[in-house]
């Protein structure tokens, strides 16, 4: 298939620049690939789409304030870092600007010396391995000096950094939020649990590659970035029990889907405690082994995320749903509205 097969018209004014005042006040488009019905509702009614025997699976990763602004210690030239992943100890892979000035041995100071980075290795495309030195606890220093790494299509300043975290964010490590989870409130989760739905958490640390456009014409030639995931034995046991009892596995967001399907593919559709790196690329033709339904935001044209939704619900129907969302003035991308998709019965 061609990348252009997943293109659609999107007016720029529909790209949400700020979160809504109330998380669950966002709109929700419910689509059924079997009946091809579309229903416009609001996110706090997602509970109506969930059955008492279901499990709702959420990604509890926490976004690091991973954007740092500092200066070279010798020339005082301005430097920007975006932390990508912790390689070991105090060593991190970062995206540096301007990278050409940062050779091995270069030192960068942040917060008037509260945090210092030494370049230990040069990578391609502006990447660097750096070793940080600091007093105290690294994450506390980062919280005080770093800024949230908002997506490139958001130009407004984020007034409250907690709005780019889910209410259940726990495990530090992401360069971007698992945005499908931003709509949930503690009260809504309590109501869902009270209905008899199991709340299950996994972790996938979202990498910067989530914003990387597909640069090839043939989607089969696209290579996904790798992201680290973890599923506990307790979570795996709960999900297997739900499946056995006839309940559905309902994933919140594409990161939860990719984690569950990665593990399901390893263990013949069953789930076990597992952790590792995944670069699974879910596109039309993929056969789902674990996930029965999911919620997700509205994604970029020609993105791998639109391809994933199309693999689940069919490309033509997904593009119809996106056209409907544009006509109904749904808000798109990270701070935008959501979609709920049920599993086609024939799969």
Curated annotation (Swiss-Prot):
Belongs to the QueA family. Its main location: cytoplasm. GO terms for molecular function: S-adenosylmethionine:tRNA ribosyltransferase-isomerase activity. InterPro entries: QueA, QueA_dom1, QueA_dom2, QueA_sf. Keywords: Cytoplasm, Queuosine biosynthesis, S-adenosyl-L-methionine, Transferase. SUPFAM superfamilies: QueA-like. One of its GO terms (biological process) is queuosine biosynthetic process. It catalyses: 7-aminomethyl-7-carbaguanosine(34) in tRNA + S-adenosyl-L-methionine = epoxyqueuosine(34) in tRNA + adenine + L-methionine + 2 H(+). It comes from Streptococcus thermophilus (strain CNRZ 1066). Pfam families: Queuosine_synth. This is S-adenosylmethionine:tRNA ribosyltransferase-isomerase. Monomer. Transfers and isomerizes the ribose moiety from AdoMet to the 7-aminomethyl group of 7-deazaguanine (preQ1-tRNA) to give epoxyqueuosine (oQ-tRNA). It is an enzyme of class 2 (transferase). GO terms for cellular component: cytoplasm. Its EC number is 2.4.99.17. Pathway: tRNA modification; tRNA-queuosine biosynthesis. It comes from the Bacteria. It is found in: Cytoplasm.
């Amino acid at each position: 298939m061609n990348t252009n097969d997943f293109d659609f018209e999107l007016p720029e004014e529909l790209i949400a620049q700020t979160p809504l005042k109330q998380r669950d006040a966002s709109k929700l488009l419910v689509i059924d690939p079997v009946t091809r019905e579309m229903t416009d509702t609001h996110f706090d009614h997602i509970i109506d789409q969930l059955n008492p025997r279901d499990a709702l699976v959420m990604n509890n990763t926490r976004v690091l304030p991973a954007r740092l602004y500092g200066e070279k210690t010798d020339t005082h030239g301005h430097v920007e870092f975006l932390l990508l992943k912790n390689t070991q100890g105090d060593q991190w892979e970062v995206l540096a600007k301007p990278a050409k000035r940062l050779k091995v041995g270069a030192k960068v100071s942040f917060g008037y010396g509260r945090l210092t980075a030494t370049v230990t290795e040069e990578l391609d495309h502006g990447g660097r391995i750096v070793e940080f030195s600091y007093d105290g606890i690294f994450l506390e220093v980062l919280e005080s000096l770093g800024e949230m790494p908002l997506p490139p299509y958001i130009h407004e300043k984020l007034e409250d950094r907690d709005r780019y975290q889910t209410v259940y964010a726990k495990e530090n490590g992401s360069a971007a939020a698992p945005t499908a989870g931003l709509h949930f409130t503690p009260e809504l989760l309590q109501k869902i649990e009270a209905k008899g739905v199991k709340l299950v958490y996994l972790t996938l640390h979202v990498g910067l590659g989530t914003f990387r456009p597909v640069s090839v014409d043939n989607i089969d030639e696209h290579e996904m970035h790798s992201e680290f995931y973890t599923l506990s034995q307790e979570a795996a046991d709960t999900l297997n029990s739900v499946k056995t009892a006839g309940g559905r596995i309902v994933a919140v967001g594409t990161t939860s889907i990719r984690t569950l399907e990665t593990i399901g593919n390893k263990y013949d559709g069953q789930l076990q405690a597992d952790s590792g790196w995944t670069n699974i690329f879910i596109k039309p033709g993929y056969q789902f082994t674990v996930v029965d339904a999911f919620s997700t935001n509205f994604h970029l044209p020609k993105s791998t995320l639109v391809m994933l939704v199309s693999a689940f619900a069919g490309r033509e129907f997904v593009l119809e749903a996106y056209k409907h969302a544009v006509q109904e003035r749904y808000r798109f991308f990270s701070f935008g509205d959501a979609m709920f998709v049920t599993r086609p019965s024939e799969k």
